[in-house]
Amino acid sequence: MIGAAELAAAQGAYTFMAGALITLVVGGVILARRLGDGLAPWAWGGVAFVLSQAARLPALTLISALVIGNAAPESGSATWTLSVVVASLTAGIFEEGSRALILSTAAKRMRSEGAGIAFGLGHAAIEAVIFTLLPSLAAIALLSGAADGSVYANLPAESSESLTTAITFLSGQSIGVATLSITERIFATVLHITLTLFVLRAVQQGGGKRDLARRLVLPIALHTVANLSTVLLLPVIGILGAEVLFAAVTLGVVAYYRRTRAALPAPAPEA
């Protein structure tokens, strides 16, 4: 039986995480509005993320089934390593490809660096909402129901057992882990902004589709390495080490962009 104090502590940690995420998203919206001369770039960034996942997840499921199989691989095994490589590579291909598609079509008037930053903020915000904020809110509701027993009302024994397993897992959340999650989300936002600027540069350079595809190799590779290195080394260096590594890779990507940045041309005048 999970104690009331343990449930309350976990609920507090998730509440802290949800509040910090909301603050991060709202702050990003305010900044994007100032930098992007409105919310259109931010909104298109969000669309780019949703589009990337709508295309990536079915493809990832199919590739995983064909290459890896249906069984969950053991951490550290060759199959697990392959699954991490596939997940990281598809994230890079589909997310950077989606950014390029939107920036070269629907958002083709967005050419300033400020608009690129706003676009990256929108991409990161929707990712944070879907993958972190909504699960945190669900965890808060579930832990609250477990504390007063309402979540178990009228449940059959088998379902109650499965629910208890889930609640036991959620009750392990702590302020420390929540803080690490928020820190990771901040660096992920910085990474998304920087990768967007790389893609924006690639789109601005013109040429045909092959030229654009060739230029996208760099942001795809950077995205893949950021994800791949962190997850692959997680079993070896632990969660704290993995977060430090992710932060270091992100800062390296930012430094590389700054070093290679060319003056971005002014947006083309509207017809």
Give the predicted meaning of each segment.
Residues 1-271:
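Hydrophobic alpha-helical segments at protein termini of multi-pass membrane proteins
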